[in-house]
């Protein structure tokens, strides 16, 4: 009788342990899905903000380019135009950053994806913003 009791208790403990392991795996996979969804939402918001900023900058840069396109230019103004053209190309390359990031990082885990996306944004946006600042500073200096 004691042997049957020990076997029954052992079976109950083993099944309870198996259920808890299964629940842990399910909660981990649900957490991974939620983290992935939140990363996609953050990327979507960032893409929308970046798109708005990009559109505004493109409009401002086109306006500046059109003012310099008419008439004779000095060597300094020619250099400013070259910088503006480079900035325009960089902004055009940012059209689909989310798709590019997903395509490049399919094999990485979620933390590596977030880090890579942030590094890529900094790598692209840093020079673009500094170039725009330099160009606008030079223009204001020339106009003033």
From Swiss-Prot:
Residues 19-43, 74-123 form a propeptide. It comes from the Eukaryota. Residues 1-18 form the signal peptide. One of its GO terms (biological process) is defense response to bacterium. One of its GO terms (molecular function) is toxin activity. Expressed by the skin glands. The record marks 59 as: Important for flexibility. The modification Asparagine amide is found at residue 70. Its main location: secreted. Keywords: Amidation, Amphibian defense peptide, Antibiotic, Antimicrobial, Cleavage on pair of basic residues, Cytolysis, Fungicide, Secreted, Signal, Toxin. This is Maximins 1/H1.
